[in-house]
Amino acid sequence: GVEARIELQPLIDATATGDTLQLRAGHYTGATIDRSLSVRGQGRGTIIDGDGRGTVLRLEAPSITITHLRVTGSGRNVSKKESGIWVDGSASDATISEVRVDDSGFGIWVNKAVRPLIAECDILGRNDAAIISDLGNGIHLFNVRDAIVRDNDIAQGRDGIYISNSTGCLIEGNRVRRSRFAIHYMYAHGNRVIGNDTDSTSVGIALMYSKHITVRDNQVRHGRTHGMLLRNLYDSRIEGNVVQSSKDGFFFSGCYQDTLQANWISANDVGIQVSDSKDNLLVANAFIENANQLVYEGYSHVVWEGGDEGGNYWSDYVGWDRDGDGIGDKRHYPSDIASYLVGRFPAVRL
């Protein structure tokens, strides 16, 4: 039989502001938290279950902490934003740590709140919808300032971490698997994406219609469509990333004044595909054994060398380094007639 549910709401209501509600292992119903308090479970045996209806846990006051428990069974209506945990705009300075979220529409949705911390959570999205748009994102930040999303493990669902209309956010040290886009920025400025690890997604990191983004020391592997998708990205720095074994390592479209520096781009079908972009600096990157190193489409202007940093390393470079300075003496023009043909006639790519 089904284990009897313990009503969580009366326990919340009986907890004073500033106190900690300690939940032993057991099966609890969903609740709304409307005052500043902490809820601490005993690990995954402390289960808060929405039984497939609505949002499971709603945070509606500042300085709430949720830790060491499992949240499961929200409703599945993503158009109604049904989520495992909903962080309301009134819930500034929320902390959600070491929480498992599964079998939900969205995992954690932060809506217009400031300074949330989401750390060391394990979020398993669904994978049972006929179309991906019927699935929710693992962590969803909408109109959020100064979020820290750190060291979470996210799999399945639509996008792993989705950030829109948000500023000052740090997305660091997360691991995302088997989602559509692992990390997806839309209309989000002044954010950092550092030291994340993505694998087996359609796109590893997607930065769209955004500016002043720093993307550093990430590892992106097995992007079925793109490793990194940069579209209408402005004045951003992409440095020290490893992008491997994807269809395109980088897909670069409509981008201006961005710097790609010291990235390791290897074993992709195409190292970098560039279209309709200008005034971007690509320097000190290593292009290693991509089937096509570079494909141009449309008009693009790329500065390939930047003063003291030197040029880029190409594994297929043919030339001499007579003066022994480690930089080839003959300019390498990677966009040869073959990649021109590939861009114009995709079937050429054999």
What is the role of each PLM region?
Residues 50-58, 79-88, 103-110, 131-143, ...:
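Extracellular beta-strand/beta-solenoid scaffold signature
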